[in-house]
C-alpha cells in the first residue's frame, strides 16, 4: 500500500486502500450471520428436505456470501462517476423489474406476496435492488437540481412523483417494509442536501397519515399493530410469531442457552432463519449476543457516515449523499428488523442486513458496501491530488 505522502508513477497502477475497520465489521456480521443461519435453519431444512439436509441453508447462504464478495469486488473497480452517469438507466431497469415481478406466471409467490423472480436454482427480489438504485438516482438528482432544491415544482415534485410510482409498485406486491425503507432513503438524501425545511416537515407530517391509511385498508396489517400491544391475547393466531420471538428473548437471559441449543427454532418460531433470526440469536447467545450485534452495526454506521462526511469536505456531494444514504438504509433496516423481533414494531418482512438468510439482500448489501469502499478510496486519492 502507498503512504499518503507519496504518489504513484504514471506507469504504475495505484493499489486500492480499504477501510480495514469497516471491512472487518462487515465480515464479522457476515460470519456471525452464517453461523446463526445454520443454527436457526437445521430444523426447517430437515423438515423440508429430510434427514441429512441440515446443511442446506448453510450451503446456500455461504454461496450467496461468496457471490456477494465476488460481485462486490467487481463493483469496487467501477468509478463513482459511472454510477452517477448511468443512474437514469439503472432506474429504468429497477422499475422494469418491479413491473415484471407483478406478472402472473413469472413471479414466485410466497405467503401471498409476489416479490421474487425465479432464476433457476434461486430467485431474485427486485425490491432489494430498487433500494440501491433509488438511492443512487436520488443522490444524482439532488446534485443536478441543486439550484431548485427550494422550488416545489422544479425540484421537489418530480422526485415525489417518482417515489409515489415506486411505492405503488411495491405495495402491489405487497411489500410495505421496502416501501418504508425506500421512502426514508429518498427523504433523508433530500434533507441532507438542504431541501426546504417547510417542504420537508410538510412531507414528514404527511407520511404518518399515509402509513395509517395503508394499515387501515389491509386488515392483516391492523392485526399486526394490535399484536404488538397484546400478543398474548391471541397467542395461537395473530400473536403467534411475536409471542414465540419474545419467548426466545426471555429464554436467552444474559448469556444464552448456548449455540445450537435454541428451542424456538424447532419449528415453533416461523421464519427463524430469515426475518426472525435475531430472536434465535438472542435465545442462543443471550443479552451479550444482542449487545454485540447492535454494537457491530453501530460501529459500521459510524464508519459509513465518516466516509460520507469526508467526501463532503472534499467537495464530492454525490459521493457524500450516496455514502450517507447507504448508512440510513442499512441502519434503518437493521433497526426495524431488531424492533420487530423485540415486539417494538409490527412485522415488516425486512431482513437483518448481512445476517439473515437471503441471496438478494446479501448480494445487494455487498454491492452497497463495495460502492462505499470506492467512495472511501476516491476520497484518499483526492487528498493526494490524484484522480480515480
UniProtKB/Swiss-Prot annotation:
Pfam families tied to this protein: FTSW_RODA_SPOVE (PF01098)
Cellular compartments annotated: Cell inner membrane
Annotated metabolic or biological route of this protein: Cell wall biogenesis; peptidoglycan biosynthesis
Catalytic reaction annotation: [GlcNAc-(1->4)-Mur2Ac(oyl-L-Ala-gamma-D-Glu-L-Lys-D-Ala-D-Ala)](n)-di-trans,octa-cis-undecaprenyl diphosphate + beta-D-GlcNAc-(1->4)-Mur2Ac(oyl-L-Ala-gamma-D-Glu-L-Lys-D-Ala-D-Ala)-di-trans,octa-cis-undecaprenyl diphosphate = [GlcNAc-(1->4)-Mur2Ac(oyl-L-Ala-gamma-D-Glu-L-Lys-D-Ala-D-Ala)](n+1)-di-trans,octa-cis-undecaprenyl diphosphate + di-trans,octa-cis-undecaprenyl diphosphate + H(+)
Principal localisation: membrane
GO molecular function, one term: peptidoglycan glycosyltransferase activity
Name of this protein: Probable peptidoglycan glycosyltransferase FtsW
Upper classification of the organism: Bacteria, Pseudomonadati, Pseudomonadota, Betaproteobacteria, Nitrosomonadales
UniProt gene name: ftsW
